[in-house]
Amino acid sequence: MEAANESSEGISFVLLGLTTSPGQQRPLFVLFLLLYVASLLGNGLIVAAIQASPALHAPMYFLLAHLSFADLCFASVTVPKMLANLLAHDHSISLAGCLTQMYFFFALGVTDSCLLAAMAYDCYVAIRHPLPYATRMSRAMCAALVGMAWLVSHVHSLLYILLMARLSFCASHQVPHFFCDHQPLLRLSCSDTHHIQLLIFTEGAAVVVTPFLLILASYGAIAAAVLQLPSASGRLRAVSTCGSHLAVVSLFYGTVIAVYFQATSRREAEWGRVATVMYTVVTPMLNPIIYSLWNRDVQGALRALLIGRRISASDS
């Protein structure tokens, strides 16, 4: 009975990671270190280029800068600990460390989702309402969209963490993951977790699904507008405006769905860990590449930043 009511204080967990094979750990360390450094450099350069270039002081780039900053932080929540565990023998993490990691993982993941929805709305306004675009996507409107994204995500995350902190853990403390995700921890708890599971399927799903539905609605309206354009060049220009965003949305939500809307067998759990790597490590690294490949203004700002040349709005 004492074990069943074990206090949460002093508890530590063991992160089992992606593999227990010593022969795979060093190659994985090198791979993920390269991906992480590329993510930091890519997203950091995007933020710096947007700040340094007056030509990029526009709503879509303001939102992109916040997305890149969120991606930079998102990768930093899980990857450093994963890299350390690939080299160290001690894979333990305290309960406080686990909850802290989970808090920022939830918060930054939802921030990404909300910012992608805000960027879809920006694309919608740019294509469907080009004349009043400056009024509809004013500085105040952009600040409100970004502020709402950060506020909603942190309130959502705080709610989860306050509930998770009340759980007791009396079974094995081995977490079959490379970071503290909520589902593995819920399976280790000996408390009644029905209220948290209910929250995940209601509030949690709403926080993730609502931005996704807004993105679908925005792109539905965009598609209808594009089909009405008389010239092929106009349609191509409209598609290129939002092509990079659509690629990022597909990558992000594709992997999220693969992780959180799947069965719970061992094979699916293993695939879930691989998919989690995709949206916590690979997607933040690919986003700057996708946006710079599709956008000449970003390419020009990055070149100017790297060679130390200052560009003005007239250079665009």
Swiss-Prot record:
Covalent S-S links between cysteines: C98-C190
Molecular function in Gene Ontology = G protein-coupled receptor activity; odorant binding; olfactory receptor activity
**Pfam short name (any one):** 7tm_4
Q: What InterPro entries is this protein classified in?
A: GPCR_Rhodpsn, GPCR_Rhodpsn_7TM, Olfact_rcpt
CDD domains of this UniProt entry? 7tmA_OR1A-like (cd15235)
Q: Which residues lie on this side of the membrane: Extracellular?
A: 1-26, 81-101, 160-197, 261-273
> Localized where?
Cell membrane
State if Glycoprotein is listed as a keyword: yes
Give the UniProt entry's GO cellular component terms.
membrane; plasma membrane
Query: Membrane topology per the record?
Result: Multi-pass membrane protein
Residue spans crossing the bilayer: 27-50, 59-80, 102-121, 141-159, 198-220, 238-260, 274-293
The residues that the database entry marks as glycosylated are N5
| Topology feature Cytoplasmic, residues | 51-58, 122-140, 221-237, 294-316
Keywords of this protein's UniProt record, alphabetized?
Cell membrane, Disulfide bond, G-protein coupled receptor, Glycoprotein, Membrane, Olfaction, Receptor, Sensory transduction, Transducer, Transmembrane, Transmembrane helix
GO BP terms: namely: detection of chemical stimulus involved in sensory perception of smell
Question: Which protein family is named in the record?
Answer: Belongs to the G-protein coupled receptor 1 family.
Relate the protein's function as given in its record: Odorant receptor.
Protein name in UniProt: Olfactory receptor 1K1
What is the organism lineage in this UniProt record? Eukaryota, Metazoa, Chordata, Craniata, Vertebrata
Point out the gene that encodes the protein.
Answer: OR1K1
